[in-house]
């Protein structure tokens, strides 16, 4: 059942659906979600999220392409398997209000390059101050990298373990993680925050790849 079919008008749900559609459109404009890839979700309330269904063009989303998912329940029919990664993030952190996943080239390639280290470190970039809690370009920002896994429950458990682990002394964890050869998950307290993090991380990753090309 689509999220636009509640028996009673649900303003919070409608607002979340609209935010999901907007995030999908803006990401498609930037070329981050080719060939129906990626998925987007926004928290409705403590118990529910609005999340994109499987196999739809994220640049042309309609309300019927967005599902209402109870955090405590199995994935609803039509869900992407990756909706479990969204559900787990919300369930583990009540401060997360939106989660956006893209297949941008910069994120996918860097994640593959750092698969062995299982970590990408950012430092020295002014734009990293666009990430919540970062006040200086000198701050060391850690972005976890996990191996891709078609067992999404196992992948969600791996991500949860990585996010629960301590960062290095003096470092700060980014509001996102990378899946090797797959892409980026970024989140924020609101949909606006999550998209800012998504955009900032994409540019930061592009800057790193550009620097490496010139340094080689």
From Swiss-Prot:
Family annotation (SMART domains): Aldolase_II
Cofactor note: Binds 1 zinc ion per subunit.
Pathway(s) the chain acts in: Amino-acid biosynthesis; L-methionine biosynthesis via salvage pathway; L-methionine from S-methyl-5-thio-alpha-D-ribose 1-phosphate: step 2/6
Cofactor(s) named in the record: Zn(2+)
Coiled-coil blocks: none
Keywords: Amino-acid biosynthesis, Lyase, Metal-binding, Methionine biosynthesis, Zinc
An example molecular function term from Gene Ontology annotations: methylthioribulose 1-phosphate dehydratase activity
Listed EC numbers: 4.2.1.109
Any one annotated GO CC term: cytosol
Enzyme class: lyase
Similarity section: Belongs to the aldolase class II family. MtnB subfamily.
NCBIfam families noted in UniProt: salvage_mtnB (TIGR03328)
Function: Catalyzes the dehydration of methylthioribulose-1-phosphate (MTRu-1-P) into 2,3-diketo-5-methylthiopentyl-1-phosphate (DK-MTP-1-P).
Protein name in the entry: Methylthioribulose-1-phosphate dehydratase
Highest classification ranks of the organism: Bacteria, Pseudomonadati, Pseudomonadota, Alphaproteobacteria, Hyphomicrobiales
